[in-house]
Amino acid sequence: MPSRLRKTRKLRGHVSHGHGRIGKHRKHPGGRGNAGGLHHHRINFDKYHPGYFGKVGMKHYHLKRNQSFCPTVNLDKLWTLVSEQTRVNAAKNKTGAAPIIDVVRSGYYKVLGKGKLPKQPVIVKAKFFSRRAEEKIKSVGGACVLVG
């Protein structure tokens, strides 16, 4: 049967309030706060706060990250960077005006030579070209333009 009163109400009027006799429920038996993290509270600190103690390495100020960032695209994916309409117009166009594909605008920096190009001239703008890519683009009558 549930009782009507909470435990604290029941203990009123009893000197020790459930904490034993002389000096039992004492002040701070384990030390205050985080005291003893390396000693008597070691297990708690190791389990729930790993890495709390000890030294950490130095901060490298002015570190230049991603200096070698150079996303690449292959020749076989080159025509996917422009719209289908541009591709159709370039195939129909016999006047010799080659379409311009700027791979830097599509998020790539370097053009690699994997795959084949269709036999129509194209102007490719990129920051870097591999030797094979440059040869293949020029073999279909295109041009390689170095940007920035």
Curated annotation (Swiss-Prot):
Tell me if Ribonucleoprotein is a UniProt keyword of this record.
yes
Which superkingdom?
Eukaryota
One of the entry's Gene Ontology molecular-function terms is: structural constituent of ribosome
From start to end residue, where is composition biased (Basic residues)? 1-30
Location of region: Disordered: 1-38
Describe the PTM: Hydroxylated on His-39 by MINA.
Q: Which UniProt keywords apply?
A: Acetylation, Hydroxylation, Phosphoprotein, Ribonucleoprotein, Ribosomal protein
Task: Return the GO cellular component terms, semicolon-separated.
Answer: cytosolic large ribosomal subunit
Q: Which residue ranges traverse the bilayer?
A: none
The answer to whether UniProt assigns keyword Ribosomal protein to this entry is: yes
According to the UniProt record, list the residues that bear Phosphoserine.
68
Q: Which GO biological-process labels does this protein carry?
A: translation
N6-acetyllysine: which positions carry it?
Answer: 47, 55, 110
Q: Which residues carry this modification: (3S)-3-hydroxyhistidine?
A: 39
Q: Name one Pfam family in it.
A: Ribosomal_L27A
Family to which the UniProt record says this protein belongs = Belongs to the universal ribosomal protein uL15 family.
- What is the recorded name of this protein? Large ribosomal subunit protein uL15
Q: Which organism is it from?
A: Pan troglodytes
What is the phylogenetic placement of the source species in the record? Eukaryota, Metazoa, Chordata, Craniata, Vertebrata
